Design a protein with these regions (language model features):
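Short, conserved phosphate-binding/catalytic loop or strand-edge motifs used
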Residues: 5-15
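Generic "edge-of-domain/loop-turn" microfeature
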Residues: 10, 20-22, 67
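C-terminal accessory nucleic-acid interaction domains of nucleic acid-metabolism proteins
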Residues: 24-128
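Short beta-strand
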Residues: 1-7, 48-52
């Protein structure tokens, strides 16, 4: 799995899969992962979409995996003040790079560094 900033309020965990399963299978898998995280660590995570039920917890937005759902692509500029970028980051940076912590200047600087998603397209994972 790979990590990127959203350029907004959260992070996105991206898993490269071979296209072998349909939308329903991916959606069900993402929902189940969110449910397990919520059950195992209820004080930390929630899969509940209601904002008033998730205060102080990390929201696992499994619905982003449904057909027709949208998500910002890596390296995309956000239409927000400060020219924030959805930027691939290394897992080791999770504690130091905020979800909206990469602006266009920082993104351009990072392009000259090692790619934290190196090997992404060589993954051979399949969801059954």
């Amino acid at each position: 799995a790979y990590l990127k900033t959203s350029g907004g309020k959260g992070y996105h965990v991206v898993v490269p899969w071979r296209p072998a399963a349909g939308w329903d299978a991916f959606y069900a898998f993402a929902r189940r992962v969110a449910e397990v995280m919520e059950q195992k660590w209820p004080e930390r995570y929630t899969a509940n979409m209601r904002k008033n039920r998730r205060a102080g917890k990390i929201f696992i937005d499994w619905a982003r995996n449904g057909r027709g759902a949208t998500s910002v692509a890596p390296y995309s500029l956000r239409a927000r003040p400060g020219a924030k970028v959805s930027m691939p980051i290394a897992w080791e940076e999770l504690d130091t790079v905020a979800p909206d912590g990469v602006d266009i200047r920082e993104a351009l600087r990072r392009l000259g560094e090692r790619d934290p998603w190196e090997g992404f397209f060589r993954q051979d994972q399949i969801l059954r």
